[in-house]
Design a protein with these regions (language model features):
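Short, small-residue-biased leader/transition segments that mark boundaries at the very start
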Residues: 1-3
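Structural signature of hydrophobic alpha-helical transmembrane segments
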Residues: 6-17, 41-44, 105-110, 139-145, ...
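Transmembrane alpha-helical segments of multi-pass membrane transport proteins and ion-pumping complexes
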Residues: 16-28, 48-53, 77-90, 117-121, ...
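Alpha-helical membrane segments and immediately flanking helix-loop junctions
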Residues: 34-80, 102-127, 218
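Junctions where cytoplasmic loops transition into the N-terminal start of transmembrane alpha-helices
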Residues: 56, 61-79, 138-139, 177, ...
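Oxyanion-binding "anion nests"
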Residues: 128-171, 178
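Transmembrane helical segments that form the transport core of multi-pass membrane transport proteins
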Residues: 157-263
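Juxtamembrane boundary at the C-terminal end of a transmembrane helix
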Residues: 263-278
Length: 278
């Protein structure tokens, strides 16, 4: 693994851990129920919609709360796409003289704060190609952590439920709550990596797997349908309703914390340590 990838993985782990625990604890202080707080913390700290759905599958949360949190993610990400490049241009050139370092820190900052992968790609391209490369790497590293976070959530809940029932928690309970589709994703990734390594798939000049047109079409259609369904289940007045107000403020406060703490982590890793190590 190259130095750039190593720093990206380190940042991903730090950001996910710190932001998840802050978002969860702050949500609980705002009197958000435990399951919704876990869904919110997972979606905000890892990768938005996918992480929210995964956490909801593990905790068995309310579908209406899940839909609300997903809606928040998708609504907030739109201004974030433009806000983050503006902040990067306004702040980073006053800290670093090297434009390349500015791009790296900006990409790391954007990759760790914007909740959706597509939003990260679009926002970081506004800054530049180097920023885009770093942002995408860090976001990919965060996405991988979905399974890790899901496992620890399941372990925590099994312990809590085991205590209440007077039974010792078992791996069987953890396995019951663990999202099995993550294993399928990992297995599919390994299979395709092996097949591509043996030259069984066509790759472009950068070594990226050439995606078949039909597969890309179905992927686009089903993702579009999924987001349309989320929108159909969302009413804008519910976003600011009294019932959801605590959840809204918890999300916004955690997102603000995410922006600040990710900036500091990216600053240290990509602005100080990486240039020192060359």
């Amino acid at each position: 693994m190259c130095i750039r990838d190593s720093f990206g993985l380190v940042q991903a782990c730090l950001v996910v851990a710190v932001v998840w625990f802050f978002a969860f604890r702050f949500s609980r202080r705002m009197k958000v129920d435990e399951r919704s707080a876990m869904i919110l913390a997972s979606g905000l700290s890892i990768c938005g919609v996918s992480a929210s759905i995964t956490a909801a599958r593990v905790v068995g949360g309310d579908d209406r709360k899940l839909s609300y949190i997903v809606s928040l993610v998708l609504i907030v990400v739109v201004p974030m796409i433009y806000l983050m490049p503006w902040l990067a241009h306004a702040i980073l050139p006053h800290i670093f003289d090297d434009p390349h370092v500015v791009q790296e820190v900006a990409g790391a900052w954007i990759g760790g704060t914007i909740d959706t992968t597509s939003g990260v790609a679009a926002s970081s391209m506004i800054v530049g190609e180097v920023a885009n490369q770093h942002a995408v790497i860090i976001k990919a590293a965060q996405n991988v952590l979905i399974g890790v976070v899901a496992f620890f959530i399941a372990l925590y809940l099994s312990t809590r439920r085991g205590d209440k029932a007077g039974q010792a928690p078992s791996l069987g309970i953890v396995w019951e709550k663990f999202p099995k589709f993550i294993i399928g994703f990992v297995a599919a990734s390994l299979v395709f990596s092996v097949l591509q390594g043996n030259g069984l798939f066509t790759a472009d000049a950068r070594g990226k797997l050439a995606e078949p047109g039909v597969a890309k079409m179905f992927s686009t259609v089903f993702f579009s349908l999924a987001f349309v369904c989320v929108g159909l289940d969302t009413r804008l007045k519910d976003i600011v309703s009294r019932e959801n107000r605590n959840l809204l403020w918890a999300f916004l406060a955690a997102q603000a914390f995410n922006i600040v703490v990710t900036f500091l982590i990216a600053l240290v890793l990509f602005g100080v340590l990486k240039p020192m190590l060359g």
